[in-house]
């Protein structure tokens, strides 16, 4: 099966004047197209750092990244990296990262604004994905008028509006109660199943991880299984 993310010999070291911390050590990982992968481990083990490197939000100290068959040149400009992220990747975070002054429809459109998509097309696509996550009746509401689960649905709609190959989710149910968390997981599984969309999820929840295709575990920056 096609590999959409390939990490080879990834190391990440954070340095200050007096301290050197190795966040990731010699990580080698392949993620297959259409796979739903969970990354687990204790706090501070490097999970989110790994996800940020996969998402081109952070650079490894050493090692190589391939995304959808393209080797990522460490010398790429910030603008080019942003373009790759916008076209290839969707992001879902624990804290939603919605703009509080914008309503649901406007929040969801943001990735297409960055792409320069015309307004009528943006609105059409935004309404489609908002309906898909079950929030058509909340389209004009602002984030402060929504529940946590509804805010995460908006964030997922925003993440998929550009039809990215890969969805990266960092503790997507971490701020939700068990009922809302289960609903978000069902939505993610549906996107994976119906679209064949690759999903990489960082989670502390063993029950949720057990429902995914594969689990990898980290400890002290090293992959242990």
Predicted regions and their residues:
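Conserved switch/coupling elements of ABC/ABC-like ATPase nucleotide-binding domains
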Residues: 220-225
């Amino acid at each position: 099966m096609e590999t959409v993310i390939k990490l080879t010999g990834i190391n990440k070291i954070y340095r200050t004047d007096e301290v050197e911390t190795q966040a990731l050590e010699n990580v080698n990982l392949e993620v297959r197209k259409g796979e739903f992968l969970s990354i687990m481990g204790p706090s501070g083990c490097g999970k989110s750092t790994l996800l940020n490197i996969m998402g081109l939000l952070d650079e490894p100290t050493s090692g190589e990244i391939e995304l959808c068959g393209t080797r990522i040149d460490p010398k790429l400009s910030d603008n080019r990296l942003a373009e790759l992220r916008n076209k290839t990747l969707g992001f879902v975070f624990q804290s939603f990262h919605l703009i509080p002054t914008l309503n649901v429809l406007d929040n969801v459109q943001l990735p297409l604004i960055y792409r320069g998509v015309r307004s009528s097309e943006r609105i059409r696509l935004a309404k489609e994905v908002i309906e898909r996550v079950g929030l058509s009746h909340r389209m004009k509401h602002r984030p402060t008028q929504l529940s946590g689960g509804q805010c995460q649905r908006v964030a997922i709609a925003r993440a998929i509006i550009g039809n990215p190959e890969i969805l990266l989710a960092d503790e997507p149910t971490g701020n939700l109660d068990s009922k809302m968390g289960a609903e978000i997981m069902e939505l993610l599984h549906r996107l994976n199943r119906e679209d064949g969309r690759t999903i990489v999820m960082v989670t502390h929840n063993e029950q949720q991880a057990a429902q995914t295709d594969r689990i990898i575990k980290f400890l002290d920056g090293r992959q242990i299984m």
